[in-house]
């Protein structure tokens, strides 16, 4: 992910340089009518500036709703950002985000629709390529197509020193004890609230799988205490009740 982001930043710097070169060329073209040239460039810059400000405000609102675990409102914001992008290839990051949010709400049909609209080409930004294949692999994994998920991950995603959630699931599918070790290792490193909850939920499921119901209950409770329409949070609430009833019977 870090390498993909670094490459994307480099591409953005290249685009900025191209923009500056074009601006300079426009000034040369309008050299004899300098005031007209400056006026045209000023108008272009003002339009771009206000476009970026509006885009940034909507983007921040979208991220705020993700932090608040209100994905329905975040989806509304993402759709606005999606409509603002006029170039099809620039819409892909919003298609990926929409797909991920719909999947977390257990709306598989919508999730797959947006993911299928993404077109990967040699012009695709590295961070978009990374996010697409990660989301595609996750979709395959959680729909029971684990071999396909493994193949997508191995062929398209470079392994990093810090394993992500999907990589841990794929590597330790048949070794829940080691899966717990790896999940516990990455949990303190999580900065994003939603991803941290996903790791806690994975720990709850894995602890339940190995029969450590006390630890499973501990993590299920941490997830279940959040108020959200996210599907795994709803399931965690049900699991807390289920394990509580089991404990009473014992």
Task: Walk through the language-model features, giving the residues of each.
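Alpha-helical adaptor scaffolds
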Residues: 100-106, 129-138, 142-143, 151-192, ...
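Alpha-helical segment of the N-proximal tetratricopeptide repeat
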Residues: 56-87, 93-105, 120
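Transmembrane alpha-helices and immediately adjacent membrane-cytoplasm interface residues
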Residues: 37-67
């Amino acid at each position: 992910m870090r390498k993909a982001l670094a490459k994307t930043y480099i591409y953005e710097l290249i685009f900025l340089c191209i923009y500056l070169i074009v601006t300079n060329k426009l000034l040369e073209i309008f050299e004899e009518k300098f005031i007209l040239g400056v006026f045209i460039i000023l108008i272009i810059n003002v339009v771009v500036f206000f476009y970026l400000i509006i885009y940034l405000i909507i983007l921040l609102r979208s991220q705020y709703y993700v932090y608040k675990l209100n994905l329905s409102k975040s989806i509304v914001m993402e759709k606005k950002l999606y409509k603002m992008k006029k170039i099809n290839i620039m819409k892909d990051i919003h298609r990926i985000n929409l797909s991920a949010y719909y999947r977390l709400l257990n709306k598989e049909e919508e999730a797959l629709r947006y993911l299928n609209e993404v077109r990967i080409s040699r012009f695709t930004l590295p961070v978009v390529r990374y996010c697409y294949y990660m989301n595609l692999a996750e979709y395959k994994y959680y729909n029971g197509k684990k071999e396909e998920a493994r193949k997508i991950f191995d062929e398209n995603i470079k392994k990093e020193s810090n394993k992500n959630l999907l990589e841990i699931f794929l590597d330790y599918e048949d070794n829940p004890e080691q899966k717990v070790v790896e999940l516990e290792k990455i949990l303190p490193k999580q900065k994003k609230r939603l991803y941290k909850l996903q790791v806690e939920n994975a720990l709850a499921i894995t602890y339940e799988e190995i029969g450590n119901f006390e630890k499973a209950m501990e993590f299920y409770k941490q997830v279940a205490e959040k108020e959200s329409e996210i599907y795994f949070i709803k399931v965690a609430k049900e699991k807390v009740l289920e394990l509580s009833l089991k404990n009473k019977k014992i």
